[in-house]
Amino acid sequence: IFINTKIIAESPENLFWAGIGDAISKELEAQLSIRGHKVSHTPLMGNQLSLICIDPLIEYGKKAYEDCKNNVDSFELEQVVLDIIVTTGLVSNFMTTENDYYYNSSLAHGFYNGTSVIPNCIQHLHGEIVSFGSLVLLTYDKNYDECDRIMAFHKEMGLPLTMADIGLTEEDLPAVAERSSVTKEWTCVPYEVTKEKF
């Protein structure tokens, strides 16, 4: 992999911001989707690697985002870029095969896919919606302490905290749940997921 952080530092900051939002989901989705499965070496390695996805984003994300806004190629920006591209990329590759297993995504991306039927969501970036989907995942999983930690990071980064932040209303939820329920990600949960609860 060749990564030029100077070019990334000069890229549109909203894309960098959304990349952080998308990367937040990797650890959460990997941990949820693999829970309760007896797995072989490769997905087990991906699962362990996923455990270092969120902390660098929380530690360096705010400064890295500010540096990207100012076109500064910094240590913090480099750490976040490596996390987004290398760490999450390796996790994705280790946790997915074409036919044998799929532990790469879960409810955060399922939520994103569900919003694809809502016209107001189209203007929002993939990682922006997935970051809110991470809050949905954590709430559905009743992992409230981690949800509070991620919400604090969202607040610091200006990532979505409410449905309104991504153009959703309560009236949209049945359509989002219906669309989400037919995605592969809907099944990547260690328990039954219902549209009503979702």
PLM-predicted stretches and their roles:
Residues 27, 31-35, 64, 87, ...:
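A short secondary-structure junction motif
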Residues 39-152:
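Active-site segments that bind and position negatively charged phosphate/pyrophosphate groups
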Residues 1-49:
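A glycine/threonine-rich phosphate-anchoring loop and its flanking beta-alpha core
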Residues 143-198:
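C-terminal charged capping/lid subdomain of soluble metabolic enzymes
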Residues 35-49, 53, 57-61, 176-198:
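C-terminal intrinsically disordered extensions
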Residues 22-29, 82, 113, 135-136, ...:
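Generic alpha-helical structural context detector
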